[in-house]
Amino acid sequence: QHYPLGDMDGEDPMGELEIPSKSFYRQNGEPYTGKVKASVTFLDPRNISTATAAQSDLNFINDEGDTFPLRTYGMFSVDFTDEAASESLNVGKVKVHLDSTQVKMPEHVPMMKLWSLNPDTGLWEEEGDFRFESQRRKRREDRTFLVGNMEIRERRLFNLDVPESRRCFIKVRAYRSERFLPSEQIQGVVVSVINLEPRAGFSSNPRAWGRFDSVLTGPNGACLPAFCDDQSPDAYSAYVLASLAGEELEAVESSPKFNPNAIGVPQPYLNKLKYRRTDHEDPRVKKTAFQISMAKPRPNSAEESNGPIYAFENLQACEEAPPSAAHFRFYQIEGDRYDYNTVPFNEDDPMSWTEDYLAWWPKPMEFRACYIKVKIVGPLEVNVRSRNMGGTHRQTVGKLYGIRDVKSTRDRDQPNVSSACLEFKCSGMLYDQDRVDRTLVKVIPQGSCHRASVNSMLHEYLVNHLPLAVNNDTSEYTMLAPLDPLGHNYGIYTVTDQDPRTAKEIALGRCFDGSSDGSSRVMKSNVGVALTFNCVERQVGRQSAFQYLQSTSARPSPASTVRGRAPSRRQRASSGSQRQPRGVASLRFPGVAQQPLSN
């Protein structure tokens, strides 16, 4: 049986998998001779849109124990099950054929190896070498293939890679606003770089991406590894983007204004790097990434010695560079995300934790992040809120821990479908470690929505772990959060780490991917879902709450007191502090106590 790898229009496959008959066997070692259900997924580096779907940075550890980068010629995962899809099958003899004509850099051919991703370490491990083999394909010319052998014993991601040595570092910082103040730098931002293959005229494929890397910003920004070239400044280019808890940050504009002071890099080096934000030629494109030429700094050039590109051997200089040194910038924009903690806590500073029964994170240095995946079926993206209150603990019952708002992410392939990975307060021991609290969590889509379904395994778990929350309102969902970490089969994602930012990023990656061990930067709406809501667009002309309050005819008299709570408003706040969006006035009503956003 032959399985092609790659299906680019107008292009031959990168290669194929060849599996001889009678190669399958069960988990206990017994041969399997029945029908096989096969699934082969290939990430084709010739398609730039597949780069963000890569599950791991491309790194391996060499014989000396040093971490080195890889350049990929494609990644693939395989899943073989029996006819009933009840048991995963192992495969004893598998051949991987790589078309040598697809390897555009001749020096890479003898260096090509087959790698597999270790899910525990996140590093790639060598599976074997390739050998040359000439084959005559049907109705085609003779081709030379690189052939490697492997055995599939567990579900892993495999890779066709070569080690690469021409490396540099890119200095990037993230800020809370366009003021770019050093005091407003953000830690815990995931900054990612996609290394594009050399441009036309250089000895490689100008359309392919070769590497994906991600780094978390610290108190002094981040240094991202990327390929570079000192002989030809245009040889390699890099595509850089940044996100915080699923929220994309914005890069500094390059058109119509091109301000080196705002970008963070002085001339003439900036022109040499050819900085372009993604909307440079089309203002309709998102503004959340930029592309540069990876021109390695010349050692005898003063204007290139102070960043933002550093030679590989100058990593320490990159990491210790002051904010005044050249660097690229991202910043937060006012959006549809809101975080509120009853007990304030700065996630950039774990030492700001205080003892309190209502602390969102009850145990310092052991931060447990919990997310639930919510699918929205409807024409618009929707803000989804979690309202988190004490549920079973005598000190916290009925009291608010905090609120989280996030906007659903549109599915790339399905119209009228979006999904949200929504944080909620984990159940468990409170700060005194005396007894547990089952957090009462309300999941509330902010729109005209109707609950369509609840994950059957999650529902069964909650029924079997009493008490069971009441769910009479079909526009929302209420649960006493599970004590167990559960997993993607339930639509619940839980990660514990010494750093709250790291715990949240790992949990978010799993939630986006819909798996308990993988990670994705692309939302996969149909897998690992806990709740599904059907949402419709509000009717045109329907009176809003603000219009109602402004209407004199809607109130019996000017002296009347407005009863109930103030209407919620869209806003976002950085973790550790709440701030109001620009240009929105604070609305206060007589006789109504001001509260955090709530339903």
From Swiss-Prot:
InterPro entries: CILP-1/2_8th, CILP-1/2_C, CILP1/CILP2
Inducers of expression: Up-regulated upon TGFB1 treatment, and down-regulated by IGF1.
GO cellular component: extracellular region
Keywords, ordered alphabetically: Extracellular matrix, Glycoprotein, Secreted
Compositional bias (Low complexity): 573-583
Tissue localization of expression: Specifically expressed in cartilage. Expressed at lower level in young cartilage than in adult cartilage. In adult cartilage, it is highly expressed throughout middeep zones.
PTM comment: Cleaved into 2 chains possibly by a furin-like protease upon or preceding secretion.
Pfam families linked: CILP_8th (PF23730), CILP_C (PF23599)
Domain of life (superkingdom): Eukaryota
Coiled-coil intervals: none
Oligomeric and partner information: Monomer. Interacts with TGFB1.
Function according to Swiss-Prot or TrEMBL: Probably plays a role in cartilage scaffolding. May act by antagonizing TGF-beta1 (TGFB1) and IGF1 functions. Has the ability to suppress IGF1-induced proliferation and sulfated proteoglycan synthesis, and inhibits ligand-induced IGF1R autophosphorylation. May inhibit TGFB1-mediated induction of cartilage matrix genes via its interaction with TGFB1. Overexpression may lead to impair chondrocyte growth and matrix repair and indirectly promote inorganic pyrophosphate (PPi) supersaturation in aging and osteoarthritis cartilage.
Record-given protein name: Cartilage intermediate layer protein 1
Organism field: Sus scrofa
